[in-house]
Amino acid sequence: MSVYPPIEGSEVFIARRRRLMAALGELPVALFAGDPSPRNYAANVHPYRAHSHFLYLTGTAWPGAVLLGEGDEWEIFATPPAPDDALWLGASATWDTLAAAIGVQAIRPLAELADAIVAHGGAAALATLPAIHPRSRAQQAALFARPWGLHDESLHGAVPLSEPDSALAEAMISVRLSHDAAALAHIRGAIQITHRGHLAGMALTSPGRRECEVRAAIEREFTAHGAVPAYGSIVSVAGEILHNEHSHQHMRAGDLLLVDAGAELHGWASDVTRTWPVSGKFSPTQRAMYDIVLQANIDAIDQVRPGVRYRDVHLQACRTLTRGLVDEGILRGDIDNLVERGAHALFFPHGVGHLLGLDVHDMEDLGDRAGYGPGRVRSQQFGLGYLRLDRDLAVDMVVTIEPGFYLVPAILQDPSLCGPFDRDGTLQRERLAAFADVRGIRIEDDVRCTSGAPEVLSAEIPKAAQAVMDCVSA
């Protein structure tokens, strides 16, 4: 793979490494870029994506490279190009050019890494983070003898790390939680491309077409503007399937199309969901539920301010949604009591959002260590237990706000979840049946926390009901 200098100037990466060192102290650090993963044989690989911690500090997608250093002294270790690389892969920047662009002192052959680690005090004194790619993980194991398992990046817990590695993880989290100007510029650029994609998808939507045609229109805009999908796009009339991987169905009049699609630009992600009527017009029940979800989105966004606990942002969305369900006669009871009991989670089972940055779920490779503040752990309550983020918000954090309403058979047919609400009359199934044409609605925005009112970075992507209908081709 050809390696190119980063888009930004070296001062961006020098500043980030200095902030990391200020948070960490004088521990030496090694971070791995990772390797391409094969699809079905060694030479047929998935598109390469550098590990985000390496990318954050270098701006460079460099397969197999390792960043090593401390203080202001940093080097990159990489495999020298093969004699025929230019034939197959094209010209690559010289190592001197790359070193200057990244702001490191030198780039050296990967074979010299082991001796360099010894020069920095040895593996026991050096901090690193678990690599994602299997080959890099094996390389780390050989160099550092760390006791990491294959599934240490579990969402529901902290990755077990040595003392130096744990210190690095906490320092990296503290630096990456709030974004610098260069990061925000890339996120804004990704969202602008996402805006184009969603408008293209809306314009192509009509009864009789397939979901994959809409997905292709969206992702064409990503490609045409130098971006890639930040994750597997969800484009589905089965909006009740939260992480639907399939887009093969034909769209019919009366369907709602849920589209969760975001562009990634220079490694920085966006994450936006809109839901629109295939026929170009909401039915009365669809419109009623859409407006409830939209109000939950608006009310939660308004809570995105410095010092506010993100769990409270989630609970605000839950209260607004529950109030709407009570108004529609689907639930009965006191709003706060219903939320405390988790009645809303029958229809809104996931958390209201997550961190956004280089990763679409930023830093989730570090598990709940990144998403949950010190002393905070996941709730055991259904619904609230899926909340990915429970930190106090700070200026220049970017989070998603994505409430939804879903009619999920696996939930609504589960006596252990619905039984208490059926028995005491809280859940009014006869009234709920009137909303059978609402399979799933989600409205998601990317929001920057500022010193004042929140900045909705994705505000230009239509979400008011009439604005959405006006964009649909039908």
PLM feature spans:
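Active-site neighborhoods and metal-handling regions in enzymes and metal-associated proteins
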Residues: 1-474
